[in-house]
């Protein structure tokens, strides 16, 4: 069962995506801010990270940079999930180290296709 770390602070988004991914056979860990996301990435070594960008305490850009510059976690794929569909927003997430980018609301089939490329 692939282990997914979902870094998201919106309870509705957490509930919906965690439920849908669990039904598809994934183990889903939740971090409600970027700081906890970095800590869980180090402690749990998930197979993939889904990262929101607008997070409290530490935003998703900084969390992505920290995860991707640490030798213990740099190989973990990160897919950013953001409500912002502007190209420059996507490019800034990729520049921070994200491996892919998808928009909210989440299209589950599209997201699963992206996830399966890394798993």
What are these regions (language model features)?
Residues 8, 32:
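Conserved acidic carboxylate
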Residues 14, 56, 74, 86, ...:
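The feature encodes the CheY-like receiver
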Residues 15-23:
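Charged docking surfaces used in two-component/phosphorelay signaling
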Residues 44-50, 55:
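Active-site beta3 strand of CheY-like receiver
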Residues 106-115:
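C-terminal output helix
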């Amino acid at each position: 069962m692939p282990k997914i770390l979902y870094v998201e602070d919106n309870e509705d988004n957490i509930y919906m995506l965690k439920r849908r991914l669990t039904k598809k056979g994934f183990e889903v860990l939740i971090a409600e801010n970027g700081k906890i996301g970095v800590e869980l990435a180090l402690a749990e070594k998930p197979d993939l990270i889904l990262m929101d960008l607008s997070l409290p305490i530490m935003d998703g850009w900084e969390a992505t940079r920290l995860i991707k510059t640490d030798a213990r976690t740099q190989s973990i794929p990160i897919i950013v999930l953001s409500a912002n569909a502007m190209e420059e927003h996507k490019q800034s997430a990729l520049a921070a180290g994200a491996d892919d980018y998808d928009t909210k609301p989440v299209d589950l089939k599209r997201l699963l296709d992206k996830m399966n490329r890394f798993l």
